[in-house]
């Protein structure tokens, strides 16, 4: 199914793709949950209640670490990518390129069963 939201068209997104997006966001700079969710929401119609368990899983698997930092009088939890997370990101990027190339091949008529 496709969800139309304003000028955006959302396709269903797997948890693995969300993991890939999260690791990509955090690789460029340490980020807090809401900031990550806003970036992921550019392509995926997800709720914070979906995002936070995935962040927890990435942390449990050793791909992310967390630290707290004060912002406007409140503690904010930041996520930082680990070396294992960077390795996972490289792997997921290769998988994404292969997947994207296959879809492009089908759309462009280069791939048929």
Write out the residue ranges for each language-model feature.
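Basic, amphipathic "hinge/linker" alpha-helix immediately C-terminal to the N-terminal HTH DNA-binding motif
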Residues: 71-93
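Generic recognition of well-ordered alpha-helical segments
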Residues: 38, 83, 98-101
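Short, hydrophobic-biased segments on the C-terminal half of alpha helices
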Residues: 52-57
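N-terminal helix-turn-helix DNA-binding core of bacterial DNA-binding proteins
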Residues: 10-50
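Amphipathic alpha-helical dimerization/coiled-coil segments
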Residues: 4-7, 90-113
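A positively charged, amphipathic N-terminal helix/segment that binds anionic biomolecules
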Residues: 1-9, 79
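Glycine-centered, phosphate/nucleic-acid-interacting loop/turn motifs that mediate DNA/RNA or nucleotide
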Residues: 62
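Short beta-strand "wing" residues that participate in macromolecule-binding interfaces
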Residues: 66
